[in-house]
Amino acid sequence: SIGVALVIITGGIDLSIGSVVGLVAVVLAFFLKVQGMDPWVAIGLTLCMSLVVGLIHGLLITKAHIQPFVVTLCGLLIYRSLSRWLTDNQSLGPVPLEGDKGYANLDQILGLDFIFSGKIPLGGFNLPTPALFLLVLAIATAIFLRKTIWGRYLYALGNNEDGARYSGIDTDRMKIIANVLCSFFAGIAGILFAFELDSVQPAQTGEFYELYAIAAAVLGGCSLRGGEGSILGVVIAAAVIRLIYNSINMVGISTHLEFGILGMVILLGVIGDEFLKKKMAERQASKA
């Protein structure tokens, strides 16, 4: 959601991140089990792959002048197909399950399993290590957006692209940076999911995650017109969406209605947000 927020702030969209998450998870598992690669090298290569994906998106959008919707929609289909082709649509895990063979560097893999999917005891509470990754990335991204000139450029680009360009901002570079960061964050998520799930399903890992991410970004205050949004709002919205999803399961509502209920809640939240913004604008105009 954080990566998608960066793209949306610039006025773009990314429909491919769910498939990027799935592809990174599959490639990591393939490197570790099939290729017997050193775990740190495998992680480095998969992260580099996610950076290249973002760079390709950015170049197609800025240099080939293809709409972000089209570029990332094609990416969604291509990356999912690659995941299924690479594994012949069979499950593959980065961490060996009972009876699994073919893993080199087993001790390193098990150590990384704790880093990416372990739990740290804090008193009577166990803190999942992925929560630390979320905290670090959220703080770093918030500082990037609010305290650096690059972050202000992203907001300026989303508010008025022509105005930003005429003021001397390299808008193409900023779009590329936003897309690269988005895919990089998706790559980190893919690694975390690979170790958390233990068994990667090429057709299902990351499925619909792009919709959850976009929903969290919009519900968290990012305008699809660009130029608005905060990382804190996005993180809170992502937590609320997960809470709603879990509540639906706990109450015992039919699983066939889960997406419908989630969609209605998000729609009502966005409508309420737009209503409040309109009222605040009218109040400020009346004071002026």
Language model features: what each stretch is:
Residues 1-35, 60-66, 214-217, 221-231, ...:
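Single transmembrane alpha-helix segments in multi-pass membrane proteins
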Residues 159, 166-173, 244-288:
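Cytosolic-side transmembrane-helix boundaries in multi-pass membrane proteins
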Residues 183-186, 196-262:
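Transmembrane alpha-helical segments in multi-pass inner-membrane proteins
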Residues 19-23, 40-48, 70, 131-136, ...:
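Hydrophobic alpha-helical transmembrane segments
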